Amino acid sequence: MSGACTSYVSAEQEVVRGFSCPRPGGEAAAVFCCGFRDHKYCCDDPHSFFPYEHSYMWWLSIGALIGLSVAAVVLLAFIVTACVLCYLFISSKPHTKLDLGLSLQTAGPEEVSPDCQGVNTGMAAEVPKVSPLQQSYSCLNPQLESNEGQAVNSKRLLHHCFMATVTTSDIPGSPEEASVPNPDLCGPVP
């Protein structure tokens, strides 16, 4: 744009005479005519003159604000809808655990000594139709139980504390396996 601003009619319908840039008493760098068709001034940017009315820019600004507001409301509605659908999906699921098909239960709390940790000790389980004596295993060598006077090496006793794996089935007509103490003093082969 040039440094000469031509005369124009302002937004208040007043005629403003033309002037040249820079204006007397203004900045020396403001050598270009800037602004709009109804509002002109001097500035230092050669690309700041717009050939339409200043009020048009206000309508553009208001339109942009309305458009951004509508977009924000739509985005907010989408986020709220997604959150509600996720909540309904999660809350409508049943709160029951999955049935694995096995009915294993622990026989009771048994403490494992530090010497037995890291070896195959197994876990006792209750099996229907099996006597409690068959389910528990005393972890003691039967020969040592009968000879009370004999000194017992506790580490050696605990190393023979093994239990066979128990599996049961709810399928009608299938044989059930029961927990049976391992007669081998070294325990089952892993």
Swiss-Prot record:
It is found in: Membrane. Keywords: Membrane, Transmembrane, Transmembrane helix. GO terms for cellular component: membrane. Pfam families: Shisa_N. The chain crosses the membrane at residues 48-68, 70-90. The keyword Transmembrane helix applies. Its main location: membrane. It is a multi-pass membrane protein. InterPro entries: Shisa, Shisa_N. The keyword Membrane applies. Belongs to the shisa family. This is Protein shisa-like-2A.
